[in-house]
Amino acid sequence: MYLVESKGGAIACMLLALLSLGTWPAVLTLLERRGRLPQHTYLDYSITNLLAAIIIAFTFGQIGSTKPDSPNFITQLAQDNWPSVMFAMAGGIVLSLGNLSTQYAWALVGLSVTEVITSSITVVIGSTLNYFLDDKINKAEILFPGVACFLIAVCLGSAVHRSNADDNKAKLRDFETAKQEASGPSTEIGTNSSKDLETNVTTKPKEGTARFLIELENTRAIKVFGKRKIIGLAITFFAGLCFSLFSPAFNLATNDQWNRLKQGVPKLVVYTAFFYFSVSCFIIALILNVVFLYYPVLGLPKSSFKAYLNDWNGRYWAFLAGFLCGFGNGLQFMGGQAAGYAAADSVQALPLVSTFWGVVLFGEYRRSSRKTYLLLFCMLFMFISAVAVLMASSGHRK
């Protein structure tokens, strides 16, 4: 079994996890904006997310010889370690609930702000719990100022969402006024939205304009016009609460701080715990998304399992997202085993990556107000500061 034994190796795992975990949300957002039902996408994503855990378990988990206190993956499957297994599976359940929630929050709140708020809540609650579970191996005088920065980022993220929503309402209102002045009687938003008002020639709308927002609304799967701002924020905060619990649960699974294992039974190695973690994550995702096929939420159209099986539009992108998330989580846990899970939560800086994709790929916050830009800058500044502080707090597990 391969173990990360150095602080440098742990930080390398965190950085690779950061890149992976910051990219897969952008892939799912792209599919939703192209009109693919989120239920279909999440089912595909869940398959490769589980497959990534299996690959990690049978490679890194089987490298080297078995030791009494660090058995290989297959050896540990037959051991009486169910108390730790249940903690790992509980972590997988809350992670799956969080990921499923964010898929809807990305549409309602935006990729950048959703990731900022959920990641900040994860650090504020999760890193605090991990600090005590890890016997305080992280430096408190460094860790908790970083946690405070993340807490401020939560407030700033909520303010960014409200300000940007107000900007979009103003754009749509001005666009409707311009249409009335140019063509007389009002027409329903969305009709001929991609045509120039003067020349009536079809043009591609510029990112951030009212026409861009209208065209996006017409093509995307989750409709956002008319939805209350509080709905998206409520889903986002629920997801953040779920995310804040999965890392402490995994910590308990691998380190048995509450002494639930029988005398002589070795603790779960990170690869075995990650396997059980991913199995429960897959099961809950499968159950909920099959239910959502027939009983959709947020006004989505009904589907069926047969329709899902026949929907190959964007399936390979969803598979890619699952691999990115699976390997990202695996790397996070490998790093956390060495440097402490409170420091490994620094991968919750993934909004820095997601914001890059949100701005570059999706044109988020284009042509927004100065107030929105100022709030966005302050939010990201707090994130950069908090991540640096959180990584500096990392200790080394004895």
From Swiss-Prot:
GO cellular component annotations of the record: membrane
Transmembrane regions: 11-31, 45-65, 82-102, 105-125, 140-160, 230-250, 273-293, 316-336, 342-362, 372-392
Tissue-by-tissue expression: Expressed in root xylem, cotyledons and leaves. Expressed in leaf blades, petioles, trichomes, stems, flower stigma, the upper part of pedicels, sepals, and the top and bottom parts of carpels in siliques.
Positions in the Extracellular compartment: 1-10, 66-81, 126-139, 251-272, 337-341, 393-398
Highest taxon in the source lineage: Eukaryota
Chief location of this protein within or outside the cell: membrane
Cytoplasmic topological domain: 32-44, 103-104, 161-229, 294-315, 363-371
GO biological process, one term: pyrimidine nucleobase salvage
Protein name: Ureide permease 2
Protein species of origin: Arabidopsis thaliana
